[in-house]
């Protein structure tokens, strides 16, 4: 299937001199002829609170379509909740359910999750990592079943700054949640996070676990387990928010002529490639170049499915 290109709207919320409104972003992305936008439901961008009624959500859905765009997914704001350090994830799940309804009303088919708490949580709170792992599995089991009721895939974005950031943990988490009957659960393969987790081993607690083949070897290990893709470069560093620096394409260390063919062979069911400029200062200034970079790769590898 031919790939469609979107960009995460959170790029224009976080770490910017001034937050760019969602409506202005839609105009800009339409002018750049992107295929879609991935909704970062944060700040002044659309949230269940800013669009509380079905009518307001219908208007938002139409607004996006009127700009020639589609939603590639949604990233909900769940960072005020806990997942690993609590026995009862009810507050997290209640908020997640609200976002499921919001996503369904907007016609969105995929919702993002992360582990919410840092990898240091186990030592800090004296939690057995296995207990924390099991808590996440049980919570995401419920989340996946709620999401399925709303026609949603659940995509876990593993990151160095969140718990379960070792390559073996990433594979094990996908398998454990799917083993509970959740075929709608999968990994979000973010190229910079994959590099930082698999090649650099950033922020890993205890003994560091890396792969000789870095992000591409992790991609191979996750074959059949990935349901969404975020693409951006990496210079091997963390930013001030303790997550991977999302370098614009061509300014980091990743060779996308190696990554793209492997991604196309990885059996990923999604036809979206989402550009992720999270926390990059003045993100709008590099948006057009990011689109052109991916567009050239799409054209170059069209014969094998790009």
Model region roles, listed by residue range:
Residues 3-9, 37-39, 71-76, 111-113, ...:
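Hydrophobic faces of well-ordered beta-strands that scaffold small-molecule active sites
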Residues 284-305:
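C-terminal helical cap(s) of enzyme catalytic domains, especially alpha/beta-barrels
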Residues 8-14, 40-42, 76-79, 116-118, ...:
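Active-site beta-loop-alpha junctions enriched in small/polar residues
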Residues 37, 141-248, 253, 305:
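Acidic/histidine-rich catalytic cores of soluble enzymes
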Residues 1-21:
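Boundary/entry segment of secreted carbohydrate-active catalytic domains
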């Amino acid at each position: 299937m031919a790939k469609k290109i979107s960009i995460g709207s959170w790029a224009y919320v976080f770490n910017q001199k001034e937050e760019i409104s969602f409506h202005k972003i839609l105009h800009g992305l339409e002018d750049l002829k992107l295929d879609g936008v991935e909704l970062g439901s944060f700040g002044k961008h659309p949230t269940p609170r800013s669009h509380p009624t079905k009518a307001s959500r219908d208007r938002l859905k139409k607004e996006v379509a009127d700009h020639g765009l589609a939603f590639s997914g949604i990233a909900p704001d769940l960072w005020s909740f806990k997942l690993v350090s609590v026995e009862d994830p009810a507050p997290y799940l209640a908020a997640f359910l609200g976002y499921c309804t919001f996503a369904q009303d907007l016609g969105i088919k995929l919702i993002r999750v992360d582990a919410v708490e840092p990898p240091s949580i186990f030592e800090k709170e004296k939690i057995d990592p296995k207990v924390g792992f099991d808590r996440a599995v049980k919570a995401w089991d419920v989340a996946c079943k709620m999401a399925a009721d709303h026609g949603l895939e659940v995509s876990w974005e593993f990151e160095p700054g969140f718990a379960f950031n070792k390559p073996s943990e990433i594979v094990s988490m996908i398998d454990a949640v799917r083993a509970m009957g959740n075929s709608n659960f999968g990994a979000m393969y973010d190229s910079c996070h994959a590099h930082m987790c698999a090649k650099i081993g950033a922020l890993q607690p205890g003994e560091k676990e890396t792969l000789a083949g870095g992000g591409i070897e992790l991609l191979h290990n996750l074959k059949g387990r990935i349901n969404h893709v975020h693409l951006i470069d990496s210079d091997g560093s963390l930013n001030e928010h303790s997550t991977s620096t999302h370098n614009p394409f061509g300014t980091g260390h990743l060779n996308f002529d190696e990554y793209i063919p492997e991604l196309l062979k990885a059996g990923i069911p999604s036809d979206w490639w989402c550009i992720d400029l999270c926390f990059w200062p003045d993100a709008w200034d590099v948006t057009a170049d990011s689109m052109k970079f991916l567009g050239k790769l799409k054209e170059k590898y069209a014969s094998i499915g790009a």
